[in-house]
Amino acid sequence: MLALPAVQANLNNIVLGWFNIGQMFSKTKDTSLIAALSTAEQDLPGIENDLFTSTQSFVNSVLWSGSGKIDDLFTSQTVYVNQRLATLYPGITYSGGTKAPTSDTTFVAGTWPPSQGRSGMLTQPSYLWSASDPAVNSIVKRGKGVHDNVLCQDPLGSPVDLSTPSAKLVLACTNPTVAGATPDSTCDSEILISNARMTYQPCKTCHSQMDPYSRVLQNFGPIGNYRTVDEKGRSIDPTVTFVPSSPLAGTTLTGVQNFTQALVSSGIIDGCSVQQMASYAIGSAIQKYSTCEIDAVRTSTDGTIKSLFSNVLLANFVRARAGGTK
């Protein structure tokens, strides 16, 4: 069954759903971010369709033409581009007789520039585009997406009421526990506001868990473009230290490549893939990472898509049925 193209395509779409790639189609972008394209090519829906095709091709190449390992979705340096995407994301190289694309209808495999430090799905432009605002990155959207969906960490609880005086002060980069305190910074960038969220309650409890996952991605802008300075022209430092209860608790890392390598070593990616596939199989999101049923499947898989799919389908909680006509 796994050799059937339709089955492979369905599993590819499950993976795209794991990363919420479909959210890309509800996003708008500041047109200044696509100024490298000719006026005729500056078609946001067209670019989004290109990015979706690119990511489908990437996932398919890893899972069915490559190693088949889930971990490689996070570490591969491959990207698929047509002429428009190659223009929008410059520096991609081609090898093995592959030439740069010359049309928007043909996608070819290329390799990201090593200097950009990209790493698999987390730096595919479609993923970054999906989890960003029109003109700036969203540390909250990216961080929550990685925490909840990519790493399958247990829910953090309900969001705080941002209309409260203490929350307003935090969002103004001001210590809410000190009467008459002045702002800690100019508070005019995503990073500076994130600093305050991770420092002061009532925001700290959740954002100290979420924001670090996004801050390692700060070198990649709202459309997945590589950059070395942020929206205010300040140098980017993608170094973070992960707090207790994170799978990487106590670890200090710089950049997304070191981040994904640490995730691979921890086993959390394979673990989350089981949870995501099982959620799809039973038609209901499994919110808790560690359960007896899911943990049993985790011990049986070898990290490949074929093993993952087979072991989830054979799990007792998937095969068991109650009620209905036999």
Regions found by a protein language model. Name each.
Residues 284:
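Gly/Ser/Thr-rich helix-start
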Residues 1-281, 291-326:
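Active-site substrate-binding loop specific to GH73 endo-beta-N-acetylglucosaminidase modules
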